[in-house]
Amino acid sequence: MEKVPMTTAGFESLKEELRWRQQQERPRIIEAISEARAHGDLSENAEYHAAKEAQSHNEGRINELEDYIARAEVIDVSRLSGDKIKFGATIKLLDEDTEEKKVYQIVGDQEADVKIGKISISSPIARALIGKQEGDVIEVNAPGGAHNYEIIKVQYI
């Protein structure tokens, strides 16, 4: 079983989602199925079919979450240090083309959300950053073309 790197916060978030799906969403869906079943003929009962589809989706996600949690290699980022960029690092970058500053944290695939500055360890920008340090310049080939970034700051917070 291949381990999946994950921050402590990401691991806790997955556990919370699993708890919610098992303890709140599952009973709610079961109740919706029961109510829809009470309406009679199931072959043309849209509420019943929608509830069954929601149940299938929920159970699939529960299985997925259980798998990720079982394979998680939880890394406490606050205990990491060093000058070189590795999993968990928070990096401040300067886009050399636009002069725009960006801040990213390198996290596991399941916790990545670029809108809040969390990039996947397997993303092109993270792969380009790993092993680099403050002052280095990286080139990232993105769908919109190549970008050059200067690494301004590396932290483990």
Curated annotation (Swiss-Prot):
HAMAP family: GreA_GreB. The keyword Nucleotide-binding does not apply. Gene3D superfamilies: Transcription elongation factor, GreA/GreB, C-terminal domain, Transcription elongation factor, GreA/GreB, N-terminal domain. Necessary for efficient RNA polymerase transcription elongation past template-encoded arresting sites. The arresting sites in DNA have the property of trapping a certain fraction of elongating RNA polymerases that pass through, resulting in locked ternary complexes. Cleavage of the nascent transcript by cleavage factors such as GreA or GreB allows the resumption of elongation from the new 3'terminus. GreA releases sequences of 2 to 3 nucleotides. This is Transcription elongation factor GreA. One of its GO terms (biological process) is DNA-templated transcription elongation. It comes from Bartonella tribocorum (strain CIP 105476 / IBS 506). Belongs to the GreA/GreB family. SUPFAM superfamilies: FKBP-like, GreA transcript cleavage protein, N-terminal domain. Keywords: DNA-binding, Transcription, Transcription regulation. GO terms for molecular function: DNA binding; RNA polymerase binding. NCBIfam families: greA, PRK00226.1-2, PRK00226.1-4, PRK00226.1-5.
